[in-house]
Amino acid sequence: MATFDDAYKILMKNEGGYVNDSDDSGGETYKGVSRRYNLDWKGWEIIDNYKRSYRRKALCKVLDADDKLQSMVKTLYKDKYWDVFDLDSIPSQTIAYQMFDTCVNCGETAAIRFAQTSLGERVTGHWTLNLLNKLAAIHT
């Protein structure tokens, strides 16, 4: 079965540290967590406190060294993008990771629509047990 920890390790290789790029549609982000799309995430309080005392390079180092913040990042990804789809029940780590990564980068509805389209399902944008079962039946 797929495991979140394995998927998270791959995701973290692809997601950066702290960025506040006005040209990025996600706006201010930390490890891929967009403030714009995760306004209520408590990790922003920690980041904002550090921003008062540290500039860019030092800020990235201190954020990455904060164990509580790292735990909060991991929990957000697990709760919002992994557990919501019950990806632990998919046998293929590759398929589970693709669903997870697509959800992180495109949003839940888009990820569901992509999966429905690729599996010949009626495209509703809603997660269903049938879709989960079809994903679970794919062996890579």
Regions found by a protein language model. Name each.
Residues 1-140:
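Cell-wall polysaccharide-cleaving catalytic domain and substrate-binding groove, primarily
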